[in-house]
């Protein structure tokens, strides 16, 4: 049996939200985010948190810490220090945060003490689960309300986690409305296996025509367009034991082909 890592998108959100989950079989990015989140939760002093190479972790924690009103500096490795962060700092600063970046663009991210406005509306210029989640986590830690306009849906793991924890969050058309003033219920989260990691093995199964099942894989519809493309190419994809646990769909996946595979054209929207 092949043991795949936990879904890193969901696990990192659990780490920031301080939700319990099985910490076995997690990748380096999740470990870095978990360690940084634990350090922040246990200390009220001015901190410097190292996120290693976790772009997701540094963006999620920036939102959560900015909302908390505490002072903190977030750093990363050489690669992470070259990734732009204005897409999260700009909306947070408009909301009332005080965040500065190196060369006004890159980490280190310095967060000063501040207080966010009680109500905030933001329209996402591009589909981005990280920007959306950063703002939702800021609303939670600041106990404020936010309305996010999302014209093109992105990964909804943060919304699902908040719903699982009894938060008052819902979608109304293209709007996500979240009342962060209400306390959430901390629960154990059963994190599914990582679909992105499974994708390589799904492809290998098809290429070798092996029918080896991959068990407990997350099949959130915002993540599985890859399966649609494979089926269009002629692969036979089957989902077994599909269920929803901790508000996330999952299933065992088998993949093979019966005759031959054909080439297809895909677009960015695919």
What would you call each of these model-derived segments?
Residues 1-270:
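Structural preference for solvent-exposed beta-strand-turn elements
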């Amino acid at each position: 049996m092949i043991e795949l890592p936990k879904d890193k998108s969901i696990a990192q959100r659990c780490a920031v939200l301080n939700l319990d989950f099985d910490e076995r079989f997690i990748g380096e990015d999740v470990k870095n985010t978990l360690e940084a989140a634990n350090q922040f939760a246990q200390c009220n002093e001015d901190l410097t948190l190292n996120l290693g190479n976790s772009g997701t972790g540094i963006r999620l924690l920036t939102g959560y810490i900015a909302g908390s009103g505490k002072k903190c500096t977030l750093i990363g490795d050489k690669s992470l220090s070259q990734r732009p962060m204005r897409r999260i700092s700009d909306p947070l600063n408009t909301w009332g945060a005080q965040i500065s970046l190196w060369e006004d663009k890159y980490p280190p991210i310095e967060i000063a003490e501040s207080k966010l406005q009680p109500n905030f509306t933001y329209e996402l210029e591009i589909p981005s689960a990280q920007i959306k989640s950063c703002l939702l986590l800021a609303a939670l830690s600041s106990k404020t309300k936010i309305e996010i306009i999302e014209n093109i849906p992105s990964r909804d793991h943060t919304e699902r986690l908040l719903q699982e924890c009894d938060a008052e969050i819902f979608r109304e058309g293209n709007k996500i409305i979240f009342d962060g003033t209400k306390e959430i219920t901390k629960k154990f989260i059963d994190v599914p296996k990582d679909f992105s990691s499974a994708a390589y093995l799904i492809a290998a199964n098809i290429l070798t025509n092996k029918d080896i099942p991959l068990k407990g894989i997350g099949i959130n519809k915002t993540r599985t367009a890859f399966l649609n493309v494979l089926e269009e190419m002629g692969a036979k994809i089957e989902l077994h034991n599909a269920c929803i646990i901790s508000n996330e769909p999952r299933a065992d996946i088998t993949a093979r082909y019966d005759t031959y595979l054909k080439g297809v054209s895909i677009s960015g929207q695919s």
